[in-house]
Amino acid sequence: MASKTYTAGVKDYRETYWEPDYKIKDSDLLAVFKVTPQPGVDREEAAAAVAAESSTGTWTTVWTDLLTDLEHYKGRAYKVEDVPGDDEAFYAFIAYPIDLFEEGSIVNVFTSLVGNVFGFKAVRALRLEDVRFPLHFVMTCPGPPNGIQVERDKMNKYGRPLLGCTIKPKLGLSAKNYGRAVYECLRGGLDFTKDDENVNSQPFMRWRDRFEFVMEAIQKAEEETGERKGHYLNVTAPTPEEMYKRAEFAKELGAPIIMHDYITAGFCAHQGLANWCRDNGMLLHIHRAMHAVLDRNPNHGIHFRVLTKILRLMGGDQLHTGTVVGKLEGDRQSTLGWIDLLRKPYIEEDRSRGLFFDQDWGAMPGAFAVASGGIHVWHMPALLSIFGDDAVFQFGGGTLGHPWGNAAGAAANRVALEACVKARNEGRELEKEGKEILTEAAKSSPELKAAMETWKEIKFEFDTVDKLDTAHR
């Protein structure tokens, strides 16, 4: 009989993975989870269980523990905090040694942090609230293929946000009629038009036909306006091979930008496409379709600030972030937080905006924040005040819903934007004087006047579901 060299039995997670005196290292990957434990499971045990199951642990002692250095590789729960206004949940702060993760692989990081641990019976609900990616890891990630400044240089557009429009109806148009709508919007004054997230290659409009008619529209609009124009050609496809085929065809046609649904398509496919864009000088617009499945429940899932961080790491030049003022979910302070995460080189911890950690991006370029969803000309002063210049404002229905047509809708948005930028540069307070600014601009723009009349009663005043914790406001 073999001699006994270790103590068998079910593990007490707290004994191994709870270390309140742990000294955090610069190279550690830090995560904070909102944990709702099962009745009878205390906080320290639940936090330690999350640390174990998301790193080196299993439910029982195994003899192969003797063949590795557990102290070096294990995750450590080092702090718990109350969740303001919630008597059941708490925050668990966990430090992971960087050697647990493959360099530059968000796929690998997420497989640990939001993998099997989310089905662990010791917790009733679990939400990944924030992650501090150490600079050691950030430097191994590709980041945005181009970044804000390079995109401005490619498009020759400075000193203001960019204007876009999602072509509507999103499904059902023929390729030729789709191209016509693109031309009218770009000719009217927009910088970009866009495929919607579920426009791929359906029977009513195959992708190759769409690409050709859209590029014809872009070239015509550029010739007539003297401005650089673009359209987000969605290359999302059933397979990576098909995705690259579509991207290559867009490049052959001379498209400046393509688009990808980074969550539904998968992180592996997305990071590969971002690398392709970098190698081929192509701008990359990112749609976040499916994000609310992951981030809207305030107790279980992944917060959007984490999805923002991983997109910047994997690569994207523009990302939908919500609008605050439109029809989609988005608390103002939280939105301001993840806008900064997308654009700035260094972000300090700020609980009032939901930021649990400092985040150093090193030399990694930032990306444009995209405001889209239920916005129209009356929102322009607030949008410019909230987002600043390094953003894209996309008016879908707020362009194509204009009573005089697509070109008039585009012209109204362009006039409204330029009026607000001028007022901002003169030192006026946009959110206080917005109505006056727009009304004055409308005197010389019948398109803007008609748009203001059309949407003067349109508001989206539903309360936000996923709010910052009350004590952090």
UniProtKB/Swiss-Prot annotation:
Its cofactor is Mg(2+). Binds 1 Mg(2+) ion per subunit. Keywords: Calvin cycle, Carbon dioxide fixation, Lyase, Magnesium, Metal-binding, Monooxygenase, Oxidoreductase. The basic functional RuBisCO is composed of a large chain homodimer in a 'head-to-tail' conformation. In form I RuBisCO this homodimer is arranged in a barrel-like tetramer with the small subunits forming a tetrameric 'cap' on each end of the 'barrel'. It is an enzyme of class 4 (lyase). One of its GO terms (molecular function) is monooxygenase activity. Its EC number is 4.1.1.39. The keyword Amino-acid biosynthesis does not apply. The record marks K327 as: Transition state stabilizer. This is Ribulose bisphosphate carboxylase large chain. GO terms for biological process: reductive pentose-phosphate cycle. InterPro entries: RuBisCO, RuBisCo_large_chain_AS, RuBisCO_lsu_C, RuBisCO_lsu_C_sf, RuBisCO_lsu_fd_N, RuBisCO_lsu_N_sf, RuBisCO_lsuI. It catalyses: 2 (2R)-3-phosphoglycerate + 2 H(+) = D-ribulose 1,5-bisphosphate + CO2 + H2O; D-ribulose 1,5-bisphosphate + O2 = 2-phosphoglycolate + (2R)-3-phosphoglycerate + 2 H(+). Belongs to the RuBisCO large chain family. Type I subfamily. NCBIfam families: PRK04208.1. SUPFAM superfamilies: RuBisCo, C-terminal domain, RuBisCO, large subunit, small (N-terminal) domain. Substrate binds at N116, T166, K170, R288, H320, S372. The modification N6-carboxylysine is found at K194. The active site is at K168, H287. Disulfide bonds: none annotated. RuBisCO catalyzes two reactions: the carboxylation of D-ribulose 1,5-bisphosphate, the primary event in carbon dioxide fixation, as well as the oxidative fragmentation of the pentose substrate. Both reactions occur simultaneously and in competition at the same active site. It comes from Halorhodospira halophila (strain DSM 244 / SL1). PROSITE patterns: RUBISCO_LARGE.
